Amino acid sequence: MSSNTSRSCSTRSRQNSRVSSQVLVDAKLHGNFEESERLFDYSASINLNMPSSSCEIPSSAVSTYLQKIQRGMLIQPFGCLIVVDEKNLKVIAFSENTQEMLGLIPHTVPSMEQREALTIGTDVKSLFLSPGCSALEKAVDFGEISILNPITLHCRSSSKPFYAILHRIEEGLVIDLEPVSPDEVPVTAAGALRSYKLAAKSISRLQALPSGNMLLLCDALVKEVSELTGYDRVMVYKFHEDGHGEVIAECCREDMEPYLGLHYSATDIPQASRFLFMRNKVRMICDCSAVPVKVVQDKSLSQPISLSGSTLRAPHGCHAQYMSNMGSVASLVMSVTINGSDSDEMNRDLQTGRHLWGLVVCHHASPRFVPFPLRYACEFLTQVFGVQINKEAESAVLLKEKRILQTQSVLCDMLFRNAPIGIVTQSPNIMDLVKCDGAALYYRDNLWSLGVTPTETQIRDLIDWVLKSHGGNTGFTTESLMESGYPDASVLGESICGMAAVYISEKDFLFWFRSSTAKQIKWGGARHDPNDRDGKRMHPRSSFKAFMEIVRWKSVPWDDMEMDAINSLQLIIKGSLQEEHSKTVVDVPLVDNRVQKVDELCVIVNEMVRLIDTAAVPIFAVDASGVINGWNSKAAEVTGLAVEQAIGKPVSDLVEDDSVETVKNMLALALEGSEERGAEIRIRAFGPKRKSSPVELVVNTCCSRDMTNNVLGVCFIGQDVTGQKTLTENYSRVKGDYARIMWSPSTLIPPIFITNENGVCSEWNNAMQKLSGIKREEVVNKILLGEVFTTDDYGCCLKDHDTLTKLRIGFNAVISGQKNIEKLLFGFYHRDGSFIEALLSANKRTDIEGKVTGVLCFLQVPSPELQYALQVQQISEHAIACALNKLAYLRHEVKDPEKAISFLQDLLHSSGLSEDQKRLLRTSVLCREQLAKVISDSDIEGIEEGYVELDCSEFGLQESLEAVVKQVMELSIERKVQISCDYPQEVSSMRLYGDNLRLQQILSETLLSSIRFTPALRGLCVSFKVIARIEAIGKRMKRVELEFRIIHPAPGLPEDLVREMFQPLRKGTSREGLGLHITQKLVKLMERGTLRYLRESEMSAFVILTEFPLI
């Protein structure tokens, strides 16, 4: 078993034991609170110094505690909740405030015949208007449903908008409904990417910070979150290995007590809550004092509904009291997760392999609600912060490991000259190996000590105690001598709490000592006031006091890396002393500092040689005469020439003839002290690769120098670009337009995919299909980041969550116009399970007005330039831009005459017209407004996808019908076709609420098509008929279902035109087909809108059905 594996196993065992113990303590605290409520004595209950085994808590109590946390059946009152069965969308649970929030409670006393609008078994689609219901039905069939959040739903009774936030549980689909503020423009699932833009500037500032300073990064984050959300206090909590938390950054109002530096017990954030933070990255409490709302569920369900994933889940009473005690009413918490080992199962996401590093916590002194889009933006910002933290943590670990290895190497070198005394008498010494307050060597009844250590007598007592109580041949490690049972721990005091002791022979020991953690912790909020009443209440100050009492006799834990270093040094010393037992200790005088530095340098040089030999790029070195004296494994692999065969050969014999002069010039310049970068050379292939083409390398040179800084030779660090060169050269010969490049089956074409401005994939070429194993039809019209590239077991599965976050950052930057993505390295899994690494380049696509319309992406495998493809793409985009320029020109030129017509109509309106003249003027106004509406329609894709919002207002049906008929009169006269209007006075005189201009557009287009395809024979007639059915909604409201029938003689519309009307748009669609297709899509946007085309032997007809509220 490797050291890493053993380290992981030991950590996992230790962490799992800690988590299990902590859950028991959490359950006991919960039980105490439930029993005593407001008389709860926090300080007495948090006595965690007792072993967890002494907490005699039955398993049923723990189960009850966990169920209360996750299945409490209470929500916050700022929203309402509905749970539906996914199979039929029938309601199986709902919160008691749902009917009130959705406006379903009648204002008058209901009669016996009236049924309640919401009960168990109600079809949820009956509660909302049709566009939202369609989105809800689509969501049910969606895999990762959270990608679609939020869905905008409008109440059927009041048209009030809500954000629907969906997630799945075992029983069905949970719909959290949050009201949309009147001054807020609702976003849709397709617009979720836009909410990222709220945090775009904050993300840019965060990424621009210099690396190597984690506290600077945390300080920047709290300021950015504070500006985004407006909370009174924003903090970054970091969880330590023992589970306790620390406030490491804070931004708060000047009049508030600072919490920066506060340490609090692990029980302040229970393990169950940490588990929920891994599932739900954002948690908002609007008002901790608000009375929670109960959830009613179907009695046939076997257990209470799980609310663990709900954004509305009510805070537990214990947490609400804690918030109240510290003067906080509202909070917003975001989890920070990073990559980690599998050591902490409770705080680890089993799907992503990430664990909970800490939290970003916002507090406010008054109730505060943050809408979903802003919460989503904050979540994204926190994800970016997590990526940065992950980098900083990894860098810190590598730096620590490097420092330990360097110190260990020097200590080992000392052992060969002065074993073992040199490691405590020279510099560096064993105190430099790991962080400690003191260290000691007890060897052959003599003691050498450094820093803060026990006395020699106390050291001997410690040795006797370790041998007696913890016998073995390895040693003993503890962070608390007091808790480990050392009888004289109190005598040693808080200066010596933690100890690492290892055997180097039968009675010889190495010691490292650490003082109490409490000595290292300072919090500005800590104070000692006899009148302080926080001592027994749940409050940060009492929590800090409890924590300080817990760590009074504890040191910082010894981490696995430190123990690996200590155990490695132990083994080395044991080995060096095996032959020395019979010899006396000889204290060799200190060597000259220069000799010592040379020895240290030798150790480092040996390590560098190993790193060079195992590097993933070809590296070779030559002496001043050009003879090879270094040839690493990668160079041997790419050329086929073994190391022993390359050493001693002139470099000119190994390179192609056309590269000899280049190499000689580089060598000459290097010997003069000038180093080259990015030079291209070609090396011959040998052995099995002899028949292959030469190896193409892009190399940098660096000089090899001696102790006096004289140049001895040159080192060439190369990058193998043979594949890229071959692909680029072949590809430069490919001719053709953009479509041929996109869909050519040639392997020379790079993988290409395209998204629109909402992040939805619109293209996926053959090369991308082959590279990923996923067909085009499986990804087009799906969200690229989350549905195509995922961290789950479908689509192109990415390596980890960080990769997905980096891609989101990059795409957000491209779409917001900040910068393009240039050769971003990322990897994903092929459908067959193989892992693929590639370089991603992405460029924004814009329309004629400079607005970003999407992103063009192509992969380089392995990193070819493919300049020709980009040129072809630019030509194609230029052609499209020219066409859009013409269209924009026409739109612009029409606007001025349209404004003039509007001005003249306003003048006529105030000039004393007769009633007939006013009616004609009103008809012309409606026609002009309809024209302006059509001209402004630039988002055909939005109409196609059903994302266009209707512009609703009160209107008269008679006026709209007259405007429709007037639009078709000229064509009617031209083709000698009569129009028969059949709509009763009581129908035409109706006042309705809806989008009258869209209704005019629909009716005029279908009426024109009917006349256009009626034979031009005198006497033929097109019938325009309107049928109304009025339905009462409660006592006061009514709605009318309108049926428009446009009947025209056979043969009617051509079959091809009917197909174009109902089928998706495709290349080559006729103008008439486009008009009817858009009309059919607009009908679907109307309330319960449907359009059918009926064909009989003698007659054909358009039948249009829709509903309007009746004023």
Curated annotation (Swiss-Prot):
Task: Please provide, alphabetically and separated by semicolons, the GO molecular function terms listed in this UniProt record.
Answer: photoreceptor activity; protein homodimerization activity
Looking up PANTHER family in the UniProt record yields:
OS08G0260000 PROTEIN, PHYTOCHROME 1
Q: What protein name applies here?
A: Phytochrome C
Q: Which GO terms describe its biological process?
A: detection of visible light; red, far-red light phototransduction; regulation of DNA-templated transcription; response to blue light
Q: Which InterPro entries match?
A: GAF (IPR003018), GAF-like_dom_sf (IPR029016), HATPase_C_sf (IPR036890), His_kinase_dom (IPR005467), PAC (IPR001610), PAS (IPR000014), PAS-like_dom_sf (IPR035965), PAS_2 (IPR013654)
Instruction: List, alphabetically, the PROSITE patterns matched.
Output: HIS_KIN, PAS, PHYTOCHROME_1, PHYTOCHROME_2
Q: Does the keyword Lipid metabolism apply?
A: no
Subunit (UniProt): Homodimer.
Top-rank taxon: Eukaryota
Q: Which family does it belong to?
A: Belongs to the phytochrome family.
Q: Where are the transmembrane segments?
A: none
**Source organism (scientific name):** Arabidopsis thaliana
Function (record text): Regulatory photoreceptor which exists in two forms that are reversibly interconvertible by light: the Pr form that absorbs maximally in the red region of the spectrum and the Pfr form that absorbs maximally in the far-red region. Photoconversion of Pr to Pfr induces an array of morphogenic responses, whereas reconversion of Pfr to Pr cancels the induction of those responses. Pfr controls the expression of a number of nuclear genes including those encoding the small subunit of ribulose-bisphosphate carboxylase, chlorophyll A/B binding protein, protochlorophyllide reductase, rRNA, etc.
Q: Which residues bind phytochromobilin?
A: 318
Which Pfam families does the protein's record reference? GAF, HATPase_c, PAS, PAS_2, PHY
Q: Domain Histidine kinase: where?
A: 889-1111
Q: Point out the gene that encodes the protein.
A: PHYC
